[in-house]
Amino acid sequence: MIYDTLNNLPNYLGMSDNLDAVIEFVMARDINNLPAGKTRIDGDKAVVTVSTVTPQTSDKALFQRRDDHLTLETDLEGSELFEVSLGELTPTKPTDEAADLTVGTAGTSIAGMLCEGRFALYLAGEPYKSGLKAQGCGK
């Protein structure tokens, strides 16, 4: 997992071709003006998804894991908490192969705050939760 500011995003060029495609896409435009839904980048190399999330408490959210790709998240407005598991994911239902998505429970995790100007990059195979409500912050 990488947690940093969007200003530092270019520092991560060269980690993977797919990540490079996302970084170049994000840095070349005002991401606040992207349309809702999915935007494909460079064919099927990467996808940018813009969506509205209603934060939920951590105990109501399952961890998710994507085995074949990285996931980069940022908040265009507001803030949310995220968690990254330090242990293995125990699936609660079969993997959705088409979406490269496995959901389930996991042990000990670390938490962080995602807000405007920051990003979290979840590595392939890394269980994480996002869109979590920060206690007392209204988001």
Residue ranges and their predicted role:
Residues D67-E80, L86-E88, T95-G104:
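Short, conserved beta-strand element in jelly-roll/cupin
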Residues G104-T105, G112-K133:
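Conserved metal-binding segment of the jelly-roll/cupin
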Residues K133-K139:
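Short, compositionally biased
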Residues M1-K45:
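Surface/interface-facing alpha-helical segments and adjacent flexible terminal/loop regions used
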Residues L72, I110-G112:
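Short, surface-exposed secondary-structure edge patches
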Residues A36-T57, D67-L76, E83-V84:
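A short glycine-rich, His/Asp/Glu-containing loop-to-beta-strand
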Residues S51-D67, T95-T108:
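Short acidic (Asp/Glu) patches
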Residues T57-S58, T90-K93, S130:
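A short local loop/turn or secondary-structure capping micro-motif enriched for an aromatic residue
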